[in-house]
């Protein structure tokens, strides 16, 4: 049986630091990423893909902001922006990957699923929004918008004021069974983009909520749902490190899950960057996964072979 791997792509798969985020820039980055993924598929792995969407959702929100202020076009809620980003990014990845596979003589279907992620409406994150989204405003404008739209706004590291939204823990995906069936039939699925569109269940129905779900934690849920053997989280550093950015910096190569959990609880990994990646790796192994990897995007193939990155095992 071929090993099944969920690949969680970081923001650098789409937009590199210093880039503006033009279509051509992003497509070039996606093509490079597609080469890595195609090589993994060529080596016999079954692949499921998930990805981040931070800069792209930011762009969509800016477009809406400009459309509303300049032309009176009604802005759509945050969950709609998340769904739009899944279509946008999924389209680029599935096209680039299909082209790359065909160059190698591999005939495989690639599809994107607009994925909804279930969260608990009683999650404490809803009482304490922390995730900055959208454009920067001056204090006066931010507070005016907060009053008009019911937003929570906070100052963001002295750079201006921004809207903040909750970041609840993912409980699972509405489309989990559909995704699993597609994967079982040999189709390459792109799902849970940007962590998925957050939804809550009320009176037997689901409805979207304005929140942001961490894409690595949602990716871990996806890996459980498709019975993956490996969860590989790709980013712009070579793995997880203790005392990161200090003289005592120590990169973790091969680590047992209990040891990694101890480091996590000691606060070695920053919330909002490496923290969720490490937590996703811990959860995956504790929930029955064989191996979790945190590695640099450009070294995905070597990381899967165990030659680089942080390799987490039971």
From Swiss-Prot:
It is found in: Cytoplasm. One of its GO terms (biological process) is arginine deiminase pathway. InterPro entries: AceGlu_kinase-like_sf (IPR036393), Asp/Glu/Uridylate_kinase (IPR001048), Carb_kinase (IPR003964). Keywords: ATP-binding, Cytoplasm, Kinase, Nucleotide-binding, Transferase. GO terms for molecular function: ATP binding; carbamate kinase activity. CDD domains: AAK_CK (cd04235). It comes from the Archaea. Its EC number is 2.7.2.2. It catalyses: hydrogencarbonate + NH4(+) + ATP = carbamoyl phosphate + ADP + H2O + H(+). Its main location: cytoplasm. One of its GO terms (cellular component) is cytosol. Belongs to the carbamate kinase family. Homodimer. This is Carbamate kinase. It comes from Pyrococcus horikoshii (strain ATCC 700860 / DSM 12428 / JCM 9974 / NBRC 100139 / OT-3). The lineage of its organism: Archaea, Methanobacteriati, Methanobacteriota, Thermococci, Thermococcales.
